[in-house]
Design a protein with these regions (language model features):
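Short "lid" loop at the C-terminus of a central beta-strand within the Rossmann-like core
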Residues: 37, 120-126, 139
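A generic structural signal for short
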Residues: 93, 133-134
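Hydrophobic adenine-recognition pocket in adenosine-nucleotide-binding enzymes
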Residues: 92-95, 120-121
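Conserved beta-strand signature within the Rossmann-like core of class I S-adenosyl-L-methionine
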Residues: 112-122
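Conserved N-terminal segment of class I S-adenosyl-L-methionine
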Residues: 1-82, 86-88, 99-106, 111, ...
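Short glycine/proline- and charge-enriched loop/turn segments
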Residues: 126-132
Length: 190
């Protein structure tokens, strides 16, 4: 399922969509991969949280810092034995090569019941030769994701999420009624 929403994005819209995708998570665990400062994930209400980033980040919610793990996400996931309820990667996979991005998504599907990713739409500020972790190394579209994970994910495409480029959510959630979900998203964004 792919739904296009022609709205300019904001943190509030991001949070509304995430809350709708996740539902009640008061008894659920989450791993936030390539978390950056994780401004929104703490607001979703997960009972158990793990934040992983390769750089020593200070999280926006200071009380969450105790759950931060300084690690390469691949090292962390390859050594992990836990299955999380949710694995989230917001503005992360574009910082990896395509090959590593597909590898990350695959690890997420193996180590969580539900996966949610959010990334810029297409190639934006991409420098494939860069080595710094904050640089975009790939650009993604639903077609690229579907090429590797045919029919696995649902999509919300927002071509005007940012002022100069779009973004999209893609997710798989076992307990989500896709028909009602689209109606809920549209209702929540009005």
């Amino acid at each position: 399922m792919t739904k296009t929403i022609d709205k300019i994005g904001s943190g509030e819209i991001y949070l509304q969509i995430m809350k709708t995708i996740c539902g009640d998570v008061s008894d659920k665990s989450v791993i936030d991969l390539m978390c950056y400062h994780s401004p929104y994930i703490p607001q979703l209400g997960f009972s158990e949280r793990t934040y992983v980033d390769i750089q020593d980040r200070k999280l926006d919610h200071k009380e969450e810092q105790q759950f931060f793990v300084l690690s390469d996400v691949f090292d962390f996931l390859n050594g992990n034995r836990k299955v999380f309820d949710f694995a989230i990667c917001t503005d992360g996979i574009e910082h990896l090569s395509f090959k590593r991005g597909i590898e990350l998504i695959t690890l997420m599907t193996e180590q969580s019941q539900s996966q949610i990713l959010f990334t810029p739409l297409g190639e934006n500020m991409v420098n494939k030769k860069a080595t710094h972790p904050d640089i975009h190394k790939s650009g993604w579209t639903p077609d690229i994701i579907d090429k590797h994970f045919k029919g696995y994910f649902s999509y919300i495409v927002m071509p005007n999420f940012h002022t100069t480029f779009g973004a999209f959510f893609f997710w798989r959630h076992n307990n989500l009624d896709k028909t009602n979900f689209v109606n809920d998203i549209l209702k929540n964004l009005q």
